[in-house]
């Protein structure tokens, strides 16, 4: 046997993560511009809707173009990196509990947070209306938002960072910082909302550290936004897209009720996100320790 026969074939070198992530973002922006232009053209020429005020159907179409852009960019990069598309963590099989956990956590956050706000007199319910189609349309819109942002920030960016030698919590912090920066041009943004957006990125990314799946983050993200805005009547990250089920009044806009930015701009939200993030990490570390103990005993 010659030396050539026993030399293993080396795999071709792959781009480092620090190069992959900017390249992915660049490709995403290219396709976002392309698909966004097509979507706005369709709204203008076919539906006769202005891009500045597209209405709920228009928002859904524009958000769909962004989701398509991030899926295209992810597919290109994963093929380039010789990684399976399943690596994004979109599989529902075996992760349906994550969908329920995300929903229940969002409900619990608002039961506590909204309940405290009412009890403290920081918000008042002054009106009620139930519009089925508005609530359903808003649910679809925020589903698209959740899937798009989770693929972008957790599925690809955090997923790639976790394949490096970086500490997993540092990787989580980096991806959460990028998530906060994604919202830097939102209306009514200031220091506390930016801190809370960073904490939201930590909260949404924490389950991914232990499952490498997006079911929990997508569900939590979806119901977080949907309950906050269309149901309870807050602004969602400074934005107001549709009519809401509850009409709220804030006697004074301050850091306890979030003011014009919405519940995400409140100190109550800050405390709750820290508590729930710690809870998820505690649960994940405990689960990992149990799995390692079982593996070693076998």
Go through each PLM region and give its residues:
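N-terminal, membrane-interfacial amphipathic/helix-forming hydrophobic leader that caps
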Residues: 1-85, 229-298
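Juxtamembrane helix-loop-helix connectors linking adjacent transmembrane helices
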Residues: 4, 37-61, 81-148, 158-164, ...
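Membrane-interface helix/loop boundary segments of multi-pass membrane proteins
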Residues: 10-14, 148-174, 206-213
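Hydrophobic alpha-helical transmembrane segments
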Residues: 18-26, 60, 64, 99-104, ...
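Functionally important transmembrane alpha-helices
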Residues: 34, 193-254
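Membrane-embedded alpha-helical segments of multi-pass membrane proteins
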Residues: 64-68, 72, 132-140, 148, ...
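Small-polar-interrupted transmembrane alpha-helices in polytopic inner-membrane proteins
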Residues: 110-113, 168-184, 197-198
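Membrane-interface helix caps and helix-loop-helix hairpins in membrane proteins
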Residues: 120-128, 182-191
């Amino acid at each position: 046997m010659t030396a050539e026969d026993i030399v293993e074939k080396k795999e071709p070198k792959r781009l480092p993560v620090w190069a992959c992530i900017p390249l992915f973002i660049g490709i995403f922006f290219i396709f976002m511009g392309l698909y966004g232009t097509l979507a706005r053209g369709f709204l203008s020429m076919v539906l006769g809707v202005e891009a500045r005020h597209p209405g709920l159907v228009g928002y859904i179409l524009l958000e769909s173009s962004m989701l398509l852009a991030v899926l295209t960019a992810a597919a290109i990069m994963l093929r380039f990196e010789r990684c399976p598309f399943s690596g994004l963590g979109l599989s529902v099989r075996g992760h349906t509990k994550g969908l329920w956990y995300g929903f229940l956590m969002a409900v619990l956050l608002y039961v506590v947070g909204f309940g405290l706000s009412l009890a403290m007199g920081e918000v008042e319910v002054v009106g009620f209306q139930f519009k089925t189609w508005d609530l359903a349309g808003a649910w679809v819109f925020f589903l698209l938002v959740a899937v798009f942002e989770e693929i972008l920030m957790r599925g690809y960016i955090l997923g790639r960072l976790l394949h490096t030698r970086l500490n997993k919590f540092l990787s989580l912090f980096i991806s959460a910082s990028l998530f906060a920066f994604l919202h830097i041009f939102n209306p009514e943004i200031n220091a506390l909302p930016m801190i809370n957006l960073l904490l939201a990125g930590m909260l949404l990314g924490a389950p991914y550290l232990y499952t490498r799946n997006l079911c929990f983050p997508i569900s939590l993200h979806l119901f977080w936004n949907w309950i906050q805005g269309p149901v309870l009547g807050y602004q969602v990250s400074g934005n107001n897209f549709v009519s809401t089920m509850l009409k709220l009044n804030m006697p004074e806009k301050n850091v306890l009720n979030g003011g014009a930015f919405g519940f995400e701009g409140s100190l109550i939200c800050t405390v709750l996100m820290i508590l729930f993030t710690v809870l998820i990490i505690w649960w994940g570390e405990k689960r990992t320790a149990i799995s390692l103990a079982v593996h070693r005993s076998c």
